[in-house]
Amino acid sequence: MSDGAFDAGRTGGLLRLSQWLSPAFPVSAYAYSHGLEAEICHGRVRDGADVAAWIEGVVRRGAGRTDAIVMLSAMQAGADLDRLHDLARALAGSRERWEETRDQGAALAATLAAMGEGDGVARAYPVALGAAAARLDLAADVVAALYLQSVVGNLVSAAVRFVPLGQAEGQRIVAGMQGAVADVAAEVVNCSIDDIAQAAFGADLAAMEHEGLEVRIFRT
């Protein structure tokens, strides 16, 4: 049983990271679909099963895994953040995908600076997040898991609004992704940037295709 004392170390770190990854944190995560909107518009993602398969591909083989590796690299002592920022840009794959990670990273850095945390330098989102998380008393696998969970949550939120899915079905998808999140989090702690590879080609192509949509709800 807790004695009521607040642990400013690990507990404080978990609370701060959860705050940064919360939908309430002003990085406008709700405005991005990562190309999912294009998949839905063209009928390639039609229901909850399609959504779950698409998101799992992003987590295991796409930007989820890749960005987690970049983020953990930014957490390391002496990390070259400018180099990692350039790498994140090279990995983005399309204009909108780059804008998504660039703008969210800039918003994260600016908000943290306004809170008295961080230098306010605008960097790609996984780099900005990793640099901030490096100051927390948290294990790398915990940071990776919470980050990947937030990726899943943001994409499910987009699907709930646009497929549309019911709220309960959306939460079943989030719960069903816990295995993928745990697997990838355990993997990436042993990875370096040399281990980066992407094979979520459908998601990458959808992100490019989204640029040509005449009517859209999401920025990407």
UniProtKB/Swiss-Prot annotation:
Keywords: Chaperone, Cytoplasm, Nickel insertion
The protein, known as: Urease accessory protein UreF
GO cellular component: cytoplasm
Gene3D superfamilies linked to this entry: Urease accessory protein UreF
Gene that specifies this protein: ureF
Stated family: Belongs to the UreF family.
Self-association state and partner proteins as the record states: UreD, UreF and UreG form a complex that acts as a GTP-hydrolysis-dependent molecular chaperone, activating the urease apoprotein by helping to assemble the nickel containing metallocenter of UreC. The UreE protein probably delivers the nickel.
GO molecular function, one term: nickel cation binding
Primary location: cytoplasm
Function: Required for maturation of urease via the functional incorporation of the urease nickel metallocenter.
Subcellular location: Cytoplasm
InterPro entries noted in UniProt: UreF (IPR002639), UreF_sf (IPR038277)
Keyword check for Cytoplasm: yes
